[in-house]
Amino acid sequence: MKTPVTSKLQIGAWLLSLGLLTACDASEPPKPTASSGLVPTEFQAGETTFNTNCAACHGKQAAGTDHGPPLVHKVYEPNHHGDQAFQRAAANGVQAHHWQFGNMPKIESVTPGDVDQIVKYVRWLQRQAGIE
């Protein structure tokens, strides 16, 4: 005959085992997303350069501001504004044509390599938002 203490110990041991199995889940950790605030390592240089040179107008995570348009928008999808469009915009500036924010000046503080990193970061943000 089991005593109430023995039954409680068995139930406690079973629950502890279940808890340990759950804690030892071997699945991969969730992948970083823009909304999680975690940017994958390969896009962090672009994020830093974007934040220094672009975010004042284009906003945090390229979401736009009252000074410039969002780059995470279907207007800037790769099939409409390819990667070279970003290079030209940084090197030459852009005459306003989609938005009413005024013309974008050329950005002399970035190199073509910097723009490549910025584009990789922006494209990653776009993919996170379902813009392919």
Walk through the language-model features, giving the residues of each.
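Short functional micro-motifs and their immediate structural scaffolds
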Residues: 29, 62
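Short, solvent-exposed mixed-charge patches
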Residues: 131-132
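Bacterial signal peptide processing site
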Residues: 25-27
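The canonical Cys-X-X-Cys-His
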Residues: 46, 50-60, 106, 118-122
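Gly/Gly-Pro-rich "capping" loops immediately C-terminal to redox-active cysteine motifs
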Residues: 36-37, 41-43, 47, 63-91
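C-terminal motif of bacterial Sec signal peptides marking the signal peptidase cleavage site
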Residues: 20-23
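Bacterial N-terminal signal peptides that target proteins for export
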Residues: 2-13
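Extracytoplasmic electron-transfer domains, predominantly the class I c-type cytochrome c fold
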Residues: 73-125
